[in-house]
């Protein structure tokens, strides 16, 4: 999602250069690998076994994501992660948990259509990653706190400006709440139970 946004905006990567064909190919292969092998790899990890699926996910999460971040670029999801880190309640969550919620938030900011949004939402939900503010331990978060997270996400030192449109701190705060509201509506309409992380 982030590398696609960087490409659309013709923004620089983390190396201060334009994306390379290889960087985009790595980002696409990383996403493909995550979608194809994550559920198998989680089951393998729980069973304490190393299988090709598990190894593929390790490669995607280390080598491909590292090369992809350098050559493909980061944008909204990681900036949102950084914004969330100013909220003490999120400190015990992993980097990946905050980036997962950041990805959904970036898609909200982009105005992704329901099909595109649901592709990532259902994947993130199925892995038990955060899809609500409560999952981030932010069930009682104030509008001011979300606005402060938005300010941190939009700081000049971060990567929000690599999106192909302008984003304000208020946009981020509203999108963080929109992800939460969408999840609750989705779970209610599908009669699903969602356990807090």
Language model features: what each stretch is:
Residues 112-197:
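C-terminal charged capping/lid subdomain of soluble metabolic enzymes
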């Amino acid at each position: 999602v982030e590398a696609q946004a960087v490409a659309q905006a013709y923004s620089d990567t983390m190396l201060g250069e334009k994306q390379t064909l290889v960087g985009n190919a790595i980002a696409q292969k990383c996403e493909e690998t995550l979608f194809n092998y994550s559920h198998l790899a989680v089951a393998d990890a729980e069973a304490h076994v190393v299988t090709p699926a598990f190894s593929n996910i390790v490669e995607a999460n280390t080598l491909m994501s590292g090369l992809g971040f350098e050559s493909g670029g980061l944008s909204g999801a990681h900036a949102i992660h950084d914004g969330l880190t100013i909220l003490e309640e999120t400190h015990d969550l992993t980097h990946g948990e905050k980036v997962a919620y950041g990805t959904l938030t970036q898609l909200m900011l982009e105005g992704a259509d329901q099909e595109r949004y649901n592709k990532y939402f259902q994947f993130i939900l199925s892995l038990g990653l955060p899809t609500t503010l409560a999952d981030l331990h932010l069930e009682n978060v104030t509008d001011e706190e979300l606005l402060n997270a938005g300010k941190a996400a939009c700081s000049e030192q971060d990567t929000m400006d690599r999106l192909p449109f302008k984003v304000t701190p208020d946009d981020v705060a509203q999108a963080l709440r929109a992800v939460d509201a969408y999840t609750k509506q989705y779970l209610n309409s599908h009669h699903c139970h969602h356990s807090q992380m």
